Amino acid sequence: MKISIYATLAALSLALPAVAQEGDAAKGEKEFNKCKACHMVQAPDGTDIVKGGKTGPNLYGVVGRKIASVEGFKYGDGILEVAEKNPDMVWSEADLIEYVTDPKPWLVEKTGDSAAKTKMTFKLGKNQADVVAFLAQHSPDAGAEAAPAEGAAN
């Protein structure tokens, strides 16, 4: 009996990081105020969900969308390199959380290039999962947030 209790506790402790990443979309909507200086969330029909800047790409539909794929947006070299090396990679909630926490290390990891640069200098120090949960609400392809296609490198 003791062994099964310990095994259950061990299994639960391994699941905690996954649970801890789940965000609160309502809190994320408020937290997104920090992001709207550069980003907007605008539906394809032109409806503004969050009016914001155009320095960064429109984040409507970002979860489940291919990396660096907003038509007409001028991306930086680092994120373009990620897209080039991982052509089938889409933004997952986990990748977005990691990226908004500190874009530079994420780019270095995904490109393998320690000199990779980002145009996004802002780092979201807390509530990342909440912001990503908010963005996922406005991402019709969020359920398609599949793992990278076979042969695609992370």
UniProtKB/Swiss-Prot annotation:
Modified residues (Pyrrolidone carboxylic acid): Q21
Source organism: Paracoccus versutus (Thiobacillus versutus)
Binding annotation for heme c: C35, C38, H39, M120
Domain of life: Bacteria
PANTHER family (alphabetical): CYTOCHROME C
Gene behind the chain: cyc
Lineage summary: Bacteria, Pseudomonadati, Pseudomonadota, Alphaproteobacteria, Rhodobacterales
Description of post-translational modifications: Binds 1 heme c group covalently per subunit.
Translocase recorded as keyword: no
Propeptide feature: residues: 150-154
InterPro entries (alphabetical): Cyt_c-like_dom (IPR009056), Cyt_c-like_dom_sf (IPR036909), Cyt_c_1A/1B (IPR002327)
Signal peptide: 1-20
Designated name of the protein: Cytochrome c-550
GO molecular function, one term: electron transfer activity
Keywords: Electron transport, Heme, Iron, Metal-binding, Pyrrolidone carboxylic acid, Signal, Transport
